[in-house]
Amino acid sequence: MKNTFLIEIETEELPPKSLKAIAQSFNKQIIEKSKTYYLKYKQTKWFATPRRIAVMILDINTSDTNFYLQTKGPSIKNAFDKLGNPTSIMKFWMQKMNIKIHEITYLNTNKGSWVTCSKITNKKSIQEILIELCRLAIKNISIPTFMKWSNNDIQFSRPVRNVIMLLNHEIIRNNVLGLETNRLLSGHKFMTNNKIILNHAYQYPELLLNSGKVIADYDARKHKIQKHASIAAQSVNGILKIKTTLLEEITALVEWPTILLATFKKRFLNLPQEILVHIIEKKQRCLPIYSTNNGTILNSFVVVSNIETSYPNNIVRGNERVIHAQFVDAEFFFKKDTKKKLIDYKPLLKKIIFHDTLGTLLDKTHRIKKLITWISKFTHANVNDCIRAADLSKCDLVTNMTFEFPECQGIIGMYYALHDLEPKNIAIAIKEQYQPKFSKDNLPSNTISYSLALADKIDTLTGLFSINKNYNISEKDPFSLRRLATGIMRIIIKKNIHINLYDLLEKSLKTYKKINNSDIILKKEIQFLFNRIYSIYDKNKYNHSIIKSILENNTKILTNIDPKIKAITYVFKNHPKILQNLIITQKRVSNILKQFKENISFNINMKTLEQIEEIKLIEQLNIIEKKYKHPFSKETYISMMLTLNSFCQLIHEFFNKVMINHKIVSIKNNRLAILFKIQNLFFTISNFSNININITI
């Protein structure tokens, strides 16, 4: 059997939402620190359950390790003469270091080359190395929050109850986190009583499985939950739509997952589906089952129990009772809330403070109405529907249902609006006003929805910047302004809203009373929003300089930024020489224009054209302008760049054969006007001169 090392840290219940990250961090630190000690092995494997994290190192080299100190000697130039013989300086250094000529090594750097020697400074046994390695790894585990216990200063995510360190059969004796290491395993908290003796490190997962009723392998446990829960759903002609975060959390809550099927009364299916799902998933950590026919929720759900028992019905009934009680509450709130119309809750918004300095939610509603009225011109949404959506947008925040289930704000408003027979698009807008909630969340689906979402987000951003224009979000972001700004930019860019960003922010500022230094606030907001554009595309590994080259010519109107970035990226990856030609040509045009500070008219006088090169140039220029008057898609921009690439040949011929700085001022100005027009044609896509094609996308 090959050499195996194991370290297990047994704790009290670890936080389920961070269990996987803690275990993976432990494994990562073991790998990183093993490099420091030149430890050779085949692979590592990590384990995690609610009450333990462990790392196993497989096929480990157990030989003692020599640690070397590298000493730098004289430079190569001073170490050897022209014949390659050691100089007196070199001989003195060799004598000092007590080494022979064959023992020297060489160090080559950008600053020069030197002779060096490596000498053994320390020899450590594998046991010593593993003790130090684990100490450093534990010290550097990434843990969200630490806690102390007992009367010592030791800190960990949760109190530590036992530590195992085994190299094959041998216990690595050490004090770890205040406890002496041993070979005693703890099995399942409820299904086993006695400690389990671990004779060999390699037996760890198998012994826990067979004797301890614990599936230590996190991924194996997760796979079992997925597989058996799906089988349970199929038994009632249903399917699961398991959210990744929920599956990870459930996996981190159980050591021995047992799948059970539970039900609730069909009458509760009349409640909003999102409320049912929220209660089942968030409140009870169970899995809702959906119909295979229409995707709606069924009156069955999956319970993932942490115990295998002879009386599973007791567990099922316990979960059903809890679910039933919460559904009854939701049913009561729904009936009570819908006794009056959603719009009738609007006056109550004056009792809810939006922000101490920014007024109430009723004040916010009035500002959103003013802003959405203006925004609707650019989103082509029905202005009356937009105003109605704004009036209703925050009304559900004062209902009983939202008070009980605050995570469902907007969703509840949508159902109440539909109950009041409001138009469907308006109801959907109430739900979607908070989208996108995270970087990859869906955008609002209709014009009213993204008009309302934009107005709501801009109002919040402007308000918070107005009370703190030096808002520091470098580390902490208590109001989630980064997420808010990302949502604003995604809506404008992805929905291709032809709106002036400066005007939008100015309109928002004017809806607030008594705002000072609005110019400073506006400047700060613009910079903040533009930084989010970089963030959006940087995450998808787009070239930073490409984004910058486009934004320089789109400081106010953000239309077509997305297809431009994707088009230039496509040409960059597939036709780099074409992009390089566009960059060189535009730089040449720009450099000439920089030499002339006069105000040159953009009007080209055709009568002043003298040479065939400038005539050909202006003819082709007019053709391209007409062809690409409204280039909106990625494909059109790619086509335009390929056309401009051919056009570059005429530009270079113009430069080579036509005197720009003509002695006759009218001719010179006319030729400069041609160059200005060419530059503006390039600017239709990007300021190519700012693109760094050496950066890897």
UniProtKB/Swiss-Prot annotation:
Pfam families: DALR_1 (PF05746), tRNA_synt_2f (PF02092). It comes from Buchnera aphidicola subsp. Baizongia pistaciae (strain Bp). Tetramer of two alpha and two beta subunits. Belongs to the class-II aminoacyl-tRNA synthetase family. The gene is glyS. The keyword Transmembrane helix does not apply. One of its GO terms (cellular component) is cytosol. Its EC number is 6.1.1.14. The keyword Protein biosynthesis applies. This is Glycine--tRNA ligase beta subunit. It is found in: Cytoplasm. InterPro entries: DALR_anticod-bd (IPR008909), Gly-tRNA-synth_bsu (IPR015944), Gly-tRNA-synth_heterodimer (IPR006194). Keywords: Aminoacyl-tRNA synthetase, ATP-binding, Cytoplasm, Ligase, Nucleotide-binding, Protein biosynthesis. One of its GO terms (molecular function) is arginine-tRNA ligase activity. The lineage of its organism: Bacteria, Pseudomonadati, Pseudomonadota, Gammaproteobacteria, Enterobacterales. It catalyses: tRNA(Gly) + glycine + ATP = glycyl-tRNA(Gly) + AMP + diphosphate. GO terms for biological process: arginyl-tRNA aminoacylation; glycyl-tRNA aminoacylation. Its main location: cytoplasm.
